Every structure is written in structure tokens, then in C-alpha cells.
């Protein structure tokens, strides 16, 4: 099974993540930030990646460390579960509509982390979550996972819908990219022979 467990303890956060790439989208998420929990639940459900996340963070200071470290830990778990990446589809993309909103996400499990974020969030918060941290979550996740990630909100007005479409787009793109290609199940999807 392609699974991973990550424990990450710093002076700012204590995190435990369990991930199963070949799951059913089952989740148990407790970050202490309600809207982040909601987004990670969407990520799990729509990627079919089972995800357990438990964080005890320094929320009495602010949400930055919890947001950043959750992205790092989930990204590390994804990279660990992928192992040598043998047989994966590697690329994934998705258009994620949500009411008036449409977001496009494309990714490459390349081993070359990069994030392009073209999402304009107008308000300072979603629930209690600082919206400036949302881009940072995606950057932290992509860096730790070793993926090239492009997220572009094409249009939309409701911030909740915009952010949720970003996470659902990521989920659907990941679902495709981590799948085993039955025609190439024993090979690395790169002419270099490694990712």
C-alpha cells in the first residue's frame, strides 16, 4: 500500500499526519482552524486520498505556523507515500466549478517544486482564517511534496467558493496524477529514469 505517516514537532506546532493514496477519501482533520479543516476534508474526499491530520499549534499567536506546517507535513506525507513514483500518471489537471466560480489547477509530480498562484482574494478572512495564508499553504504543500503546481482562479466573486474550488481542483488533479498507469506500472514516468 502507498501510505505514509509523518510526525512533525517544533516549538510552534505538533503535527501528526497519516495518508493513504489508494484510499476512499476518508478523513479525520483537526487543525484548530475551522475553514482549513473544511478545505482539507475537501482535499481528501475529492482526491480519494485518506487523510488524518491532528495539529496542536500556537494559535494563541496567530494561524501562520499551523497553516504552513500543515502544508509541509501533508506534502511530506504525499512524497513519502509516492516512494520512487514508479507507475504514477505524474500529471494531473482539473477545472473546478463552484456556483459562480471556476478555478483551473494543473500539477506535475516532478521532484521540482514550484508554485504559480493566480488567485485574488479581496477580504482579510474566511471564517477566522487569514486569507493571506491560503497561498502560503499551497506553496508549503508543493515545496514539501516536490510538485510543480499551478492554481488559477478564472473568475468568481465569493471568497468561500474561490478557495474551495482551489482545494477541490487540487484534489481532482492529485487524484489523476497519483493513479498508477496500468500500461507503465513498472516504470518511472520520466526519460531520465527518476523523478
Swiss-Prot record:
Domain of life assignment: Bacteria
Catalytic activity: D-erythro-1-(imidazol-4-yl)glycerol 3-phosphate = 3-(imidazol-4-yl)-2-oxopropyl phosphate + H2O
Pathway info: Amino-acid biosynthesis; L-histidine biosynthesis; L-histidine from 5-phospho-alpha-D-ribose 1-diphosphate: step 6/9
Enzyme type, top EC level: lyase
Keyword Amino-acid biosynthesis among UniProt keywords: yes
GO biological process, one term: L-histidine biosynthetic process
GO cellular component: cytoplasm
Gene Ontology MF, one: imidazoleglycerol-phosphate dehydratase activity
SUPFAM superfamilies reported in the protein's UniProt record: Ribosomal protein S5 domain 2-like
Enzyme nomenclature, EC number: 4.2.1.19
UniProt-listed PROSITE patterns: IGP_DEHYDRATASE_1, IGP_DEHYDRATASE_2
Location in or out of the cell: Cytoplasm
Family (UniProt): Belongs to the imidazoleglycerol-phosphate dehydratase family.
NCBIfam families: PRK00951.1-5, PRK00951.2-1, PRK00951.2-4
Protein name (Swiss-Prot/TrEMBL): Imidazoleglycerol-phosphate dehydratase
Species this chain originates from: Rhizorhabdus wittichii (strain DSM 6014 / CCUG 31198 / JCM 15750 / NBRC 105917 / EY 4224 / RW1) (Sphingomonas wittichii)
Gene: hisB
Amino acid at each position: 500500500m502507498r501510505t505514509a505517516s509523518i510526525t512533525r514537532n517544533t516549538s510552534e506546532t505538533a503535527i501528526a499526519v497519516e495518508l493513504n493514496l489508494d484510499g476512499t477519501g476518508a478523513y479525520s482533520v483537526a487543525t484548530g482552524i475551522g475553514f482549513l479543516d473544511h478545505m482539507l476534508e475537501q482535499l481528501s474526499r475529492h482526491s480519494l486520498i485518506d487523510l488524518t491530520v491532528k495539529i496542536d499549534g500556537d494559535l494563541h499567536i496567530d494561524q501562520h505556523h499551523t497553516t504552513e506546517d500543515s502544508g509541509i507535513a501533508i506534502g511530506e506525507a504525499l512524497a513519502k507515500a509516492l516512494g520512487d513514483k514508479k507507475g504514477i500518471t505524474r500529471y494531473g489537471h482539473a477545472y473546478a466549478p463552484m456556483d459562480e466560480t471556476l478555478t483551473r489547477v494543473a500539477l506535475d509530480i516532478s521532484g521540482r517544486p514550484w508554485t504559480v498562484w493566480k488567485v485574488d482574494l479581496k477580504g482579510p478572512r474566511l471564517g477566522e482564517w487569514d486569507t493571506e495564508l491560503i497561498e502560503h499553504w499551497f506553496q508549503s504543500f508543493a515545496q514539501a511534496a516536490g510538485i510543480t503546481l499551478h492554481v488559477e482562479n478564472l473568475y468568481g466573486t465569493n471568497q468561500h467558493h474561490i478557495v474551495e474550488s482551489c482545494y477541490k481542483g487540487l484534489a481532482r488533479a492529485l487524484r489523476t496524477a497519483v493513479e498508477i498507469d496500468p500500461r507503465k506500472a513498472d516504470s518511472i514516468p520520466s526519460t531520465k529514469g527518476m523523478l
